[in-house]
Amino acid sequence: GSDSDISEATNIEDYFDDNSINKSKYKRDLSVDRKLIGLEQMLWIKNNLNKKFKWSIIGQQVLMAQVYLPTIFANMNKKILPDYLHKYLKIGGVNVPFNTDAWDGYPKERERLFKELKKADSVLVLTGDTHNSWLNNLYDENNNFIGVEIGTPAISSPNTIDTFGSLTDGIEEGFIKENKNVKWTEGKHKGYTLLKLTKDKSEVSFVYVNTVKSKVYEVIDTNKFNVKPNTPII
């Protein structure tokens, strides 16, 4: 299908605009100029975002905030880690992008997107496929606040504790301490995210369950955050 088929929008009530980006068609064949969502979807966003709605919701698949690996990675013993992770140990604490399949690998296009997002009243970016929970502030290259990113936890995919075990607490603390954009992250539990919107706030609930292998489960923990319109998480 054409690029025009890969954007979806749904207006809910009178203050919520839901916009979904499909990245998968572009990931398969990255061009030299590094387009993640492509011109057609960028133009669609340009032509549709405005201040008519209190909240503009962007749904997409990869971390949008600038995130670097914390120093703890540089101090890890590679003998206890699988081979595919060894390359990341060299850049722990170095402040260079480690996941170039995410928006950190497309900084120019991210800036173009941020320019368009400024047209909205209050932006929430809903991010999946990161395997962990995230709550990030989004800033452009001039340190202008753009919106808040909400990364939903994994259900079946491996999260931080599945890969790093007892190092998980230190990794979470490092991400928060060493990245100004990361206000909170959690990689120990599986679950889902609930979002409750009003004109005055957005209530974000990260809900964790005791098992993802059965239809019968119990909620074991919930982390709740309130996001105010056009306001960074402190």
What are the functions of these language-model segments?
Residues G1-I234:
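Metal-dependent phosphoester/phosphodiester hydrolase catalytic core
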